[in-house]
């Protein structure tokens, strides 16, 4: 039975954008999610995909990894560097741990393997909407300054002292915010899994280690001897630097 149409409560339909070169799969997803009160756009290639992203508001993205001549992971990477929209990966075969780590590192938030049940797929869409990063919803105006860096939450931009921008995936961005909100507090891997907004049952502790390594490579002069993100052996990680917070350009007291 379909859920109540949000339009009856004066709310717009949530928009799901799907990229899959399988015509039958596109039709199935569009038909099923439409019945359950979603707006669905299904496309076959990255050109159409980017056109929709540029012209419409999208709440969840579903990317098939097996796109023939195109690389689904590259689409995930590109999207995650410029948007916090949740990304669900679908694959024709069950992903190995290493593939999941790579996908998480690039910015995916969930996985589902073909063939999958439509009810499970619907549930994952709804979960993705619930855990969408709050930064986008609240338009957080905070900026964090630390060491030689500034992180602007509203614009999702990490800027060096020289003024150059360093791109962050959604997972890297969320982890960095978690550290900056609690400088020098030890955060466990479980806390970091929650902060990165990925499903715990779909990942392994090592995926957090990979994200940490990526952040160190972007922030640290020598990532092998980190000065900012340090390891608390057996406990997790902590951010070892003073952090200043400003709100819309006004420094917090």
From Swiss-Prot:
DNA-binding region listed in the record: 141-241
Protein name, per record: Regulatory protein VirG
Post-translational modification summary for this protein: Phosphorylated by wide host range (WHR) VirA protein.
Pfam families on file: Response_reg (PF00072), Trans_reg_C (PF00486)
Keyword tags: Activator, Crown gall tumor, Cytoplasm, DNA-binding, Phosphoprotein, Plasmid, Transcription, Transcription regulation, Two-component regulatory system
Cellular location(s): Cytoplasm
GO CC annotation terms, alphabetical: cytosol; protein-DNA complex
